[in-house]
Amino acid sequence: QQHKVLRVMGKKLTRKALEMLRKLSQKAAKDAEDAAEAAGDDEEAAATEGDDKDAEEKKDPYIEFWEAFGKNIKLGLIEDSSNRTKLSKLLRFKTSADGGDKWSSLEQYVGRMKEWQKSIYYISGKDMEEVKSSAFLERLMAKGLEVIFLTDPIDEYAIQNLTEFDGKKLQSVTKEGLKFGDEEDVDTKRAELYKEQMKPLTKWMKGVYGENVEKISVSVRLASTPCIFVTSQYGYSANMERIMQSQAFADNKRTQYLVSKKTMEINPRHPIVVELLKRSEEAPDSEETKD
């Protein structure tokens, strides 16, 4: 197996297979575009398009391949660094664009991005219900930003080996340092104002939680939720921690070492947080306030 000729043959076979899959995926995408244009010209077709959506997707030969062998493509993304760019174009994910019902490529995602959007956003979880209802999506949905849903245990491992696509950085919405790309001077000033306004509360809360949290900060990602816990930019996400801890031969000591402390983000506009700020200033030692 280590013979030079066999290694060369293996590389050529891999390239041929990837080229075949690329053509299959591109043909499927073109057929979908042609079908959409035809439906737009035909009122009757447009009226039945929604009913036939699932059937059309099942007929897509590349989607059939993806649903059967998608995990192998993701494994290739992890193990084959020389073909990572080619493999990334074969990936398919469900996203918030259509409620998580349809597969999309990263190229299609980039094509739908806002003009000012600089990152490809994703969220991971154990199932579709969990990621769809996540509080991490609140501000992104309000801004009309599309988020990729990662629900396969291997997804996050694969994405960690793909730091960017088409010049766009892949960013987890559950980690700190989240930015949207449309921030203006007024937004920056408002964020600084909230940070200064909430400083007494963040300092008091850090004293209450102590070593249980890394820090307390003011959130830019929350809209209707009072607070949330996020992981550090280079730490494991909560979903990745769950996967590691559930593995049969997991090293608990090593897992605990790699699990980072969480940062607690508070929503400065939420009534509960505003009231807590007031109480922390008026009665910081009160057991009722701490509870």
Task: Please tell me what each predicted stretch does.
Residues Q1-D291:
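Conserved GHKL (Bergerat-fold) ATPase module
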